[in-house]
């Protein structure tokens, strides 16, 4: 199959049965392999969707600068879309995130600004605050803001969930989704609940994260969620 751009290869990721882990369980376990997306993660979907929707709304145009605070995966999806569509891209990212992510982002043409991992989101040195500061300083720059942009859950409501329904129909009892911005779990859960009202939706959250509502709030090593 021939595509006009790499962006058209985003989505329609394969689903693979997990045989070893679930062999002693009275159920079938499947994994949707989002690492098959060209940028390497599920966040390619929202990077492309946020850019497309902002263009259609007349909010951005090629040549502008896109700035995004991210743990890296959304940054890779956004940098990929920016490279194809002709935007400059600046990614603000905590120092905790892997050097490999920075290498990929730079290969896609993005400029990387590292920030202290321990900085709270409200701190002037945080990746969110630094992104806002850069947006004020750079002409024709925009923060598409994965944290509050409706295009984030919409990408999963319109595409990811539909792919799951195409593969499983109503023969699905539970879906487990990691939680970062909440866009994936929100969009997928909304659509699946419409089609399969009794489906159970489980959010995977690291120990120490505030999102799951646990008693123990502490630092953790896992990147991109929590």
Go through each PLM region and give its residues.
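PLP-dependent amino-acid enzyme catalytic core
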Residues: 1-226
């Amino acid at each position: 199959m021939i595509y006009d751009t790499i962006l058209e290869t985003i989505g329609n990721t394969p689903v693979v049965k997990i045989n070893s882990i679930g062999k002693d369980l009275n159920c079938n376990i499947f994994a949707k392999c989002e690492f098959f997306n060209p940028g390497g993660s599920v966040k390619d979907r929202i990077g492309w969707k946020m850019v497309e929707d902002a263009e259609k709304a007349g909010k951005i145009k090629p040549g502008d600068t896109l700035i995004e605070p991210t743990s890296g995966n959304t940054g890779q999806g956004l940098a990929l879309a920016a490279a194809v569509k002709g935007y400059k891209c600046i990614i603000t990212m905590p120092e905790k995130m892997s050097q490999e992510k920075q290498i990929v982002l730079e290969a896609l043409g993005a400029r990387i600004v590292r920030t202290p991992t321990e900085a709270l989101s409200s701190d002037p040195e945080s990746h969110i605050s630094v992104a806002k500061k850069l947006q004020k300083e750079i002409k024709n720059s925009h923060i598409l803001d994965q944290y509050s942009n409706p295009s984030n859950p919409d990408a999963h409501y319109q595409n990811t969930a539909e792919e799951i329904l195409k593969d499983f129909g109503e023969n699905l009892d539970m879906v487990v989704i990691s939680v970062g911005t909440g866009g994936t779990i929100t969009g997928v859960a909304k659509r699946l609940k419409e089609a399969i009202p009794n489906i159970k939706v489980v959010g995977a959250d690291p120990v120490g994260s505030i999102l799951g509502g646990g008693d123990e709030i502490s630092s953790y090593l896992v990147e991109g969620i929590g």
